[in-house]
Structures are given as structure tokens and as C-alpha cells.
């Protein structure tokens, strides 16, 4: 609100046509909850609301004089996740604060983006989170730029890539692998098929040939939007599916089934190779520097050694591998480091992606129609709770930062049967309420130790204990984060 945003509330049940018009119905695919009403009309449960806010802007902003402005909501979102997990971190129904900025040009979008960047920094700083801001994939959202707020956590599902020597930070999904392999200058040898019984994995093949996994080139068969494709990369590397998806401009990318692999390779799984393969082959750029490498022969129990680039066709070469810890930083050349993180917020420069598809335009100073420039900004409320709980706890329970604690303090009566203690507690509680403090009064007829344990478990920042010292006008104050008594 302090940065000029206005709060609205959009519906969760949305006509499917809204997402078809923007092209995102296909992009979300099976991750979108879909249903029909009694008239057989198609609806979806909103996974995100860029389209609706763009439509609202079409009714509000007609002239360049109406810009810039920013709208936001706090609304429930729905995504049919394949594998919901990690408690509140990846779920099918979640609450999100999403905001959308509208500007007349890129310079205006940059300014709005910077304001939201500052606002988010303030929010996560107030939550006392240990976080990193990392470059990220735009994914189904699309647009010009994406950054994520990653709360560092041992239970985080994302890998946050950092650097020992500079402030480089990236999501693993888009982190560039710096190619440090020197081109092989040796003479190209003739291909030779080798019988390799009872081996299938890279490690087994390496053991058979007495070489390192990096000396091999592995072939992975995938299905991209229903079409089979192959990716080849160094044997000691893993495919980065985000990079592969972007290269192919695919909506869905998944490993091919064993049946599909056998269909295109005419061999069991584990013996695929690029030589003679009749599907598109996409090659990681590090393979281009290799010579006389070993690949699967597309024949069960066989491999081919001394394979070179001239021996097979490549549809395209690109950076396709996942980065590994210790790889070279793209910015400064120092070793990269890994952390785990929980994505608690994100920022997107959408540009004119949704304006172009939905017809969101305004009249400029020359009375000509121009597309509106949009930004999108989200915070996952439950994810924030999960991240704070992970970063602020001990063996006795939670230690909520004061900004988001369910209560500012708890008043604990040592003996609920002691009238003096009860009276003092009720007076203190009434005073706190009058001053606007949200206080918990624990007047249960329980042993003091039980009450103390419960307050620690809940994680209330301060505990005010009223016991025998009441008769002398004394109380005990304990700060949860420090355990010190006053």
C-alpha cells in the first residue's frame, strides 16, 4: 500500500476461455484444475491471475494519463501438482499475495519493478528471513525477466546457486554451465562396436571400459509434447529439463517410457546412442569438443567406441546440462556453491506478453494505440510461514519473530486457584488489550511446567509468568528467543 498499490479481489472460478486467449491454458496443461458447469461450459480454478488483472486494466486505463498504477489481491490459488509434498511448501491449494503493475513503456516498468523489489525486501526483512534473490526461469508466466526470493532452508526443494567470490545468485534451473573443456586435438579413429553384456548404467559401462564417466556421452530419450527426442551430454552430467524445455519451446517434457525407448532404439533401456537414431538429437555444447567417445549402440548389450561428431546428425547444440557444485561462476570464475531454498516470493517483468494477446492498449500523447507494459509480483503466504518455522525453531518448538507471531506475549498464571494471581493476570491482560497488544492469557488449571512447555512449543515471543511474587508486585518475563528471565 505504501508503494501505491490498490487492493482488489478477483474470482477463483474463471472461464477457461480467459486462459485460452492468452495461450496459457496449453502452457499450464494438466497442472490446471478444470471443471464444467451445469450448462457444460468449461471453467478452471485460477492458478494465477495475470489475465483477469489485464482485463480489469482494459476497463480502467485508456489514456497515458491513467498510468502508472498497481493492483494487488490476497487470494487462494489452485494448481494440480503432480506430487504435492513438503507440508505447506508444495500444495494444490494455497494463499498468495499477487500484485500487477501497469506502465506505458519499459522505463516505467523498470521503475515499478524497482518499487516492488524494495517493498519485497522490506517485507522479508521484517519477517527476519535469511534469503537470497536469484535469477529464475520465467516458466509459464513468460516475459522478460524473473527473480525469486529464496529463503535458505535445509528442507527447501529448490537448489540456490551462489559463488565463493562474488554476489552471483541463480536458481539451478537457469544457471549457465561454463564450458571449461579444452577441445580434443587427437586424431579421429574409426568407430568400433563392442559387446558389453550385463552393463547399462554409465558407472557400469565406465567400469567395463576402465574409463571415467566423463569419457562417455550418454543419450537420454524424452517425449516433448508427444514427440520423441534425444539429448546427448557428457556421461558425468545431468540434463537440465528447464533448459531443454526452453530450447524446444515445449509445453510438457517428460522421460520417455521404456516401451518408447525400445521402439526408437531397438534395444533395452541403457543402450541408446545418437548413431543412426531416427529422431531429433539435441547436443550439449561440451560434447562438441570431444573426440573418440563411447556411446550406446542402439543394440542391447552393445556400445560403440571412437564415435565423433561426423558420425551422427545434430538438430541443435546448446547448454543443456545442470550446473554442479564447484563449477566455474559465470560472473567471476570462482567455484559455485549450493544451498537449498524455499521460494517465498517472485518478481516478473512481463513486458507486453499479456497486452499483446489480450489487446490491452492505451492512447499515447500522439493519440496512437500502444501496448501496456506489465509486471507481476507474488508472495506465498503459507510458504513464508514454513520458511520462518524452519529457520526459527529449537528442540522445544517454534520461535516466531514478533512481526508474525500469533500473540505478542503470553500471560501464564502459575496457580489458577490463587485469586491474587488470577486478579493480577486479568488486570494485566485488560491493560494490554486496551493498548492494542494481542496477548494470550493462559489461565488453565494445569501444572506450570505444562503451560511453560506449551508456550515454548507455540513460539510466543514473550512469556509473562505470574506466581508467588505477585504479592510483592513482581512478575517474571522470559524472551523466547533467548530464554533469559527478568
Predicted region positions:
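Active-site loop/lid in soluble adenylation, ligation, and acyl-transfer enzymes
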Residues: 1-81, 214, 222-223, 286-290, ...
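C-terminal, non-catalytic macromolecule-binding modules
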Residues: 205, 375-404, 486
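C-terminal structured "cap/appendage" subdomains that terminate the fold
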Residues: 428-486
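Extended, low-hydrophobicity, polar/charged segments
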Residues: 50-58, 83-99, 104-377, 381
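Generic long, charged, amphipathic alpha-helical segments
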Residues: 397-451
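Short acidic loop-to-helix transition motifs that present clustered carboxylates
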Residues: 13-16, 260-263, 443-450
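A structural preference for short, hydrophobic beta-strand core positions in alpha/beta folds
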Residues: 10, 133-135, 255, 440-444
Amino acid at each position: 500500500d505504501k508503494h501505491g498499490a490498490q487492493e482488489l479481489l478477483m474470482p477463483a472460478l474463471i472461464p477457461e476461455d480467459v486462459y485460452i486467449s492468452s495461450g496459457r491454458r496449453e502452457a499450464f496443461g494438466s497442472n490446471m484444475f478444470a471443471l464444467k458447469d451445469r450448462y457444460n461450459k468449461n471453467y478452471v480454478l485460477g492458478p494465477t491471475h495475470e489475465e483477469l488483472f489485464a482485463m480489469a486494466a482494459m476497463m480502467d486505463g485508456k489514456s497515458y494519463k491513467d498510468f502508472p498504477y498497481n493492483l494487488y489481491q490476497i487470494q487462494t490459488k489452485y494448481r494440480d501438482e503432480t506430487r504435492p509434498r513438503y507440508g505447506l511448501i508444495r500444495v494444490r491449494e494455497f494463499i498468495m499475495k499477487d500484485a500487477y503493475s501497469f506502465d506505458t513503456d519499459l522505463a516505467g516498468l523498470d521503475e515499478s519493478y524497482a518499487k516492488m523489489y524494495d517493498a519485497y525486501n522490506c517485507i522479508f526483512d521484517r519477517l527476519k528471513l535469511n534469503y537470497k534473490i536469484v535469477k529464475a526461469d520465467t516458466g509459464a508466466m513468460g516475459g522478460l525477466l524473473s527473480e525469486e526470493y529464496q529463503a535458505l532452508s535445509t528442507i527447501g526443494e529448490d537448489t540456490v546457486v551462489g559463488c565463493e567470490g562474488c554476489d552471483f545468485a541463480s536458481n539451478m534451473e537457469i544457471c549457465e554451465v561454463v564450458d571449461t573443456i579444452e577441445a580434443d586435438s587427437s586424431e579421429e579413429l574409426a568407430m568400433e562396436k563392442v559387446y558389453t553384456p550385463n552393463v547399462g548404467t554409465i558407472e557400469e559401462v565406465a567400469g567395463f571400459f576402465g574409463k571415467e564417466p566423463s569419457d562417455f556421452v550418454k543419450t537420454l530419450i524424452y517425449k516433448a509434447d508427444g514427440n520423441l527426442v534425444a539429448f546427448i551430454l557428457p556421461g558425468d552430467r545431468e540434463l537440465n529439463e528447464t533448459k531443454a524445455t526452453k530450447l524446444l519451446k515445449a509445453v510438457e517434457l517428460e522421460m520417455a517410457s521404456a516401451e518408447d525407448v525400445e521402439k526408437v532404439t531397438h534395444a533395452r533401456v541403457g543402450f541408446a546412442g545418437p548413431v543412426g537414431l531416427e529422431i531429433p538429437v539435441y547436443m550439449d555444447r561440451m560434447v562438441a569438443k570431444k573426440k573418440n567417445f563411447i556411446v550406446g549402440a542402439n543394440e542391447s548389450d552393445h556400445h560403440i567406441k571412437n564415435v565423433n561428431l561426423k558420425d551422427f546428425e545434430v538438430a541443435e547444440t546448446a547448454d543443456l546440462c545442470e550446473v554442479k557444485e564447484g563449477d566455474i561462476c559465470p560472473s567471476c570464475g570462482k567455484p559455485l556453491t549450493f544451498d537449498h531454498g524455499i521460494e517465498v516470493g517472485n518478481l516478473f517483468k512481463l513486458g507486453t506478453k499479456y497486452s499483446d494477446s489480450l489487446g490491452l492498449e492505451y492512447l499515447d500523447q500522439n493519440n496512437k494505440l500502444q501496448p501496456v507494459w506489465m509486471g507481476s509480483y507474488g508472495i506465498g503466504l503459507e510458504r513464508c510461514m514454513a520458511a520462518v518455522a524452519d529457520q526459527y525453531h529449537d528442540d522445544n518448538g517454534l520461535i516466531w519473530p514478533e512481526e508474525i507471531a500469533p500473540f505478542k506475549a503470553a500471560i501464564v498464571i502459575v496457580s489458577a486457584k490463587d485469586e491474587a494471581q488470577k486478579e493480577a493476570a486479568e488486570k494485566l491482560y485488560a491493560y494490554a488489550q486496551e493498548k492494542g497488544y494481542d496477548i494470550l492469557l493462559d489461565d488453565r488449571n494445569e501444572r506450570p511446567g505444562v503451560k511453560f512447555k506449551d508456550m515454548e512449543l507455540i513460539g510466543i515471543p514473550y512469556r509473562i509468568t505470574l506466581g508467588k511474587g505477585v504479592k510483592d508486585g513482581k512478575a517474571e518475563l522470559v524472551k523466547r528467543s533467548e530464554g533469559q528471565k527478568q
